[in-house]
Amino acid sequence: ISGDVYNSDHHSLAAQMAFARELYRAAQAGVQIFIIHGNHDPDEAWRADVPLPPSVYVFSSDKVESVPLLVGGETAAMVYGISYKNRHMRENLALRFRKKDEDTFSIGMLHTELGVAGSPYAPCTVDDLRNTKMDYWALGHVHARKTPSMRPYMVYPGNTQGLDRSESGEKGCYLVDVGAYGTVTLKFIVTDAIRWMDMEVDISSFQNPEELVREVVKQRATLREKTGKPNIVRLILRGQGVLQKAVSTPEGQTYILQLLNDKEKFHHIRKARNKWFHHGKKPDSNIINDLLSVLEQFDIKADILI
């Protein structure tokens, strides 16, 4: 886990218990866990009121440490890592890493804003990481999934659950398979329970609000089928035409929302703001209720839940 176990330096007891519970579940399955602190959960703010299982190793913020990854009681790889001491880390921590000659396979863990010079989040370059001779880099900090390098692999898996509408699309983690000769294969595993999505509709060809509503309902059904899970959707209306004026006024938006509500048996559209349509009835699922409650506390408009 390459930093930011928690999304802030406030680690509630409930969050700690939930995290520890999953770590114990992993331990029962024989899974080792390696953790470094990031900017949201730096070493100086880390709280561990709930004990973690012995199979969990949390890396120090004082120096780069190396810990064996055991498979069947034998060392399969060495894991290198260093934590953030405080929220801002302007040092290029990559320069502290160096693979040992005797390592069969080496994994580097770093919380970094790669390629952004002057960043307060351990800035470094691809060449800095490559020069360490590590065989794989497990990177944290960036919430989007991306792979800056494939030789060696430098991987940002992104986060496992989108937190707001800026984090749209599939979220999850990577299962990394290392072959007998050090070949690396990545498989993305989807883990998000709720997905943030954007839906764009061009209104140019519509002659009346009913045509717009039919198109939105059609696209919404397609999106449900595609993702197979609840979605929080930002509806973006683009283009010009007969409906442009109507959808730009509060009265017109209210009318469109009423038409959409009439088409939905289990969803209620709550409000509209400018070009954003918001869908707000809380479904029965506890996790969705919890998510919408959090969004409302922070006045984040939840758009369309489908």
Regions found by a protein language model. Name each.
Residues 4-8, 113-115, 240-242:
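A short, flexible beta-alpha/helix-coil linker loop
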Residues 9-185:
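His/Asp/Glu-rich metal-coordinating catalytic cores
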